From Swiss-Prot:
Binding site for a 2,3-bis-O-(geranylgeranyl)-sn-glycerol 1-phospholipid: K327, G363
Pfam families in alphabetical order: FAD_oxidored, GGR_cat
Name of the featured protein: Digeranylgeranylglycerophospholipid reductase
Reactions the enzyme catalyzes: a 2,3-bis-O-phytanyl-sn-glycerol 1-phospholipid + 8 A = a 2,3-bis-O-(geranylgeranyl)-sn-glycerol 1-phospholipid + 8 AH2; 2,3-bis-O-(phytanyl)-sn-glycerol 1-phosphate + 8 A = 2,3-bis-O-(geranylgeranyl)-sn-glycerol 1-phosphate + 8 AH2; CDP-2,3-bis-O-(geranylgeranyl)-sn-glycerol + 8 AH2 = CDP-2,3-bis-O-(phytanyl)-sn-glycerol + 8 A; archaetidylserine + 8 AH2 = 2,3-bis-O-phytanyl-sn-glycero-3-phospho-L-serine + 8 A
Binding site for FAD: A13, D32, C43, A44, G46, R95, V119, D274, G286
Amino acid sequence: MKYDVVVVGSGVAGPIVARDVAKAGFSVLLVDKKPAIGTPKQCAEGINVNVFKEFDIPYDKRFINREIYGARIYSPSGYTAELRYDKVSGVILERKVFDKMLAYYAAKAGADVWARTEVIDLLRKEGKIMGVKAKHEGELVEIEAKIIVAADGVESTVARLAGINTYAPPHEFDSAYEYEMIIEGYDPDLIHLWFGNEIAPRGYVWVFPKDEDRANVGIGINSDNEKTAKYYLDKWLKENNIPTKKILEINVGLVPVGGFVRELVKENVAVVGDAARQVNPVHGGGMYEAMKAANILAKWIVKALEEENLELLKNYTKEWWEVEGPKMERLLKLRRAMEKLTDEDIDVFVQLLGGTDLEKLAGGNYFEVVKALMKHPKVLMSKRRLEILKALL
């Protein structure tokens, strides 16, 4: 069988590529190795509300658990900073439904969709990549394609088979552990984030409300830590007297927080999303970045097919680095600075930060925030804090 494009992986990036290319009239096959697209989830499920309009996704209550109005962060000593809007700023998704619906939208646009289909090798003829070999419901199939998209996650098989260098050292990954559980006592209109070296080394604990008394409660820490993410999460729950006898779901995962893939295309294979390490280095969220990259990639796939010139595919790398690269590099720089903070530093900065500051930091636009902080006596008194901030400018 033959297709113009085979997209491997049906998270958030893959279906958007498949949908947009199919809309342009080209034949597309979207495959995913899981028998049920969207499971298991490996995500806190929070996303900015603007993505629906930006990426032409229906605002469908079937996959929206809760609308969110802001965020509250907590320092090691209990100081807080809050960002609260008068209108909805984000939503907590039901990823099992959301991912499946993205695949549905791709199918409605004209793409074929196969679940329980695992790519095991690339199809090569005379040294050229001509498609993929896959196990589809247990049977070996060969699928020819002009372009192959590796959207198959952090351990991308397709990228490795194509020879795309996705290597990153262990330090560039976070280990995440999450409970979906019954929990009370936290404002369900906000997401909640706790920082501290004893709480979550290099990361944070989160509570993302899915209902009035149900939330994703998780943690991300450096993956090369000698203790596990589960250890730190259970410790935090115990210290905060939060019962752990009403756990509805457990999810674990490895999150890339650096090591961006430099060359996103090799021959006729393009890598996108977690497979390309396109994840916000500060908070570890990858849905928006995956969608943005998928949007750019789909545009260049369509142009390459329309003009019958696969060399145009390389413009995906160029455009992503021009549009998203500078922001991602700034966020990585911010993360490196955050890694040097002591708990006392975190206490000081949380006390000094306002809601507008939090918004700028989350978006990577931290220059104004840093300059303002550097003038504060509590920062000027500390040579180390001053040096950390100076390194960001």
